[in-house]
Amino acid sequence: MSNIYQIYLISDSTGETLDRIFTAIKAQFKNIDYKIHTYSFTRTENQILKILSNAKENQNSIILYSIVDSSLAKYLARNSEEKKIPCFGVLGDLILSFSKLLNQKASHLSLIHISEPTRHA
């Protein structure tokens, strides 16, 4: 069995968020061998099925995703589970928690990272 981990970073935008998160994760573990597969602007079920098919063919696949469309995120999670591929959403729980704390519904819009003025209270 190969000890090279196949890391799938799936985003509905540029993938910058996932890249930074995986950088933080891999800093916590010494001596891991991995290959990154980056999929940006993933916004359809068909795209997800193609990615999952590829991930299933490889050993040691792990999926990290940042997809703000909740139905598409659930689709990815459900299909990953069916294929027994570990899959972790990095934004869903945070968006839900902030929505509750701020007493606002999240827009669930995917945005390309742009500079925005910092707001201070």
Give the location of each predicted region.
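N-terminal accessory targeting/assembly segments
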Residues: 1-25
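Helical mechanochemical/support elements of P-loop NTPase systems and associated helical scaffolds
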Residues: 14-18, 47, 72
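Extended, charged alpha/beta regions that create polyanion-binding interfaces
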Residues: 43-45, 52-112
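A short beta-strand-loop structural module common to alpha/beta enzyme folds
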Residues: 31-43
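Structural signal for conserved beta-strand scaffold positions within catalytic alpha/beta enzyme cores
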Residues: 9, 38, 89-90
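Short, surface-exposed connector motifs at secondary-structure boundaries
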Residues: 3-6, 32-34, 56-62
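Short, solvent-exposed amphipathic alpha-helical segments in soluble enzyme
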Residues: 23-28, 79-82
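Single conserved hydrophobic/aromatic residue that forms the stacking wall/gate
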Residues: 112-121
